[in-house]
UniProtKB/Swiss-Prot annotation:
GO cellular component, one term: cytoplasm
Domain of life according to the entry: Bacteria
Protein name: Phosphoadenosine 5'-phosphosulfate reductase
Record lineage: Bacteria, Pseudomonadati, Pseudomonadota, Gammaproteobacteria, Vibrionales
SUPFAM superfamilies: Adenine nucleotide alpha hydrolases-like
Annotated localization: Cytoplasm
Pathway of action: Sulfur metabolism; hydrogen sulfide biosynthesis; sulfite from sulfate: step 3/3
Catalytic residue list: 239 (nucleophile)
Length: 253
């Protein structure tokens, strides 16, 4: 597979860009997750970074990427509303894996946001989307800019939701390469990887949580619920980080 220049790809039309990336994705599907990370670091233009919410299975990507490049910046967008167990999990994994952690937050504090806008997460889809833009999307863009990121690693998996079922391993989102090494992994493969490296699930896993975000928009799993229904009251699956709005040159996939 050829080396890819971001500037060259961004000069193409959406259709040309998508076709070019599709050719590479066919080959990436044949590689292991570890081989994909190595390929990305050797063949994609720009500085790497890994975004992590330190959710249920976060240790997988943190181990996978830092084992190959130990000083990779780890980006956390902290809303201020994470579970206490999440903050403890962040400290645990940062110490265990010697992570190069970078924390980014919204320009307005949680209390200031509530004073100005009320509890956005109680204001339907529109309120949730505004909340996510303020607390997740804008801080993430600032992180990508300040760290001069060209390769954005993420741990999204197709099995997690319908909105992720057709994602490619490699795309362009918000002007950078988006790379998903474990996209095709199953829950069983995740479990075996964590077991092999003696890595923990998030502490709330044992309390019945399948997915963990903010305290006010995360629900414990109950019989009959899908994983998607445990977040954002079932109104949304994505927090906005992984949705390309097209403003900064994305492949639209």
């Amino acid at each position: 597979m050829p080396k890819l220049q971001l500037s060259e790809l961004l000069s193409l039309t959406k259709v040309e860009q998508t076709l070019r990336l599709a050719e590479v994705n066919v080959e990436l599907e044949k590689l292991t997750a570890q081989e994909r990370v190595v390929w990305a670091l050797e063949n994609l233009e720009g500085n790497p970074a890994l975004s992590s919410s330190f959710g249920i299975q976060a240790a997988v990507m943190l181990q996978l990427v830092t084992e190959i490049k130990s000083d990779t910046p780890i980006i956390l967008t902290d809303t201020g509303y994470l579970f206490p167990e999440t903050y403890q999990f962040i400290d645990q994994l940062t110490d265990r894996l010697n992570l190069n952690l970078h924390v980014f937050t919204a320009d307005e504090s949680p209390n200031w946001q509530e004073a100005r806008y009320g509890k956005l997460w109680e204001q339907g889809v529109e309120g949730i989307e505004k909340y996510n833009k303020l607390n997740k999307v804008q801080p993430m863009r600032r992180a990508l800019d300040q760290l001069e990121v060209g390769i954005w690693f993420s741990g999204l998996r197709r099995e997690q939701s319908g909105s992720r079922a057709n994602l490619p391993i490699l795309s362009i989102q918000n002007g950078v390469f988006k790379f998903l090494p474990v996209l095709d992994w199953t829950n069983k493969e995740v479990h075996y990887f964590l077991k092999e490296y003696d890595l923990p699930y998030h502490p709330l896993w044992d309390q019945g949580y399948l997915s963990v975000g903010d305290t006010h928009t995360t629900q414990k799993w109950e019989p009959g619920m899908s994983e998607e229904e445990t977040r954002f009251f079932g109104l949304k699956r994505e927090c906005g980080l992984h949705e390309d709005d097209g403003e900064l040159g994305g492949s639209g996939i």
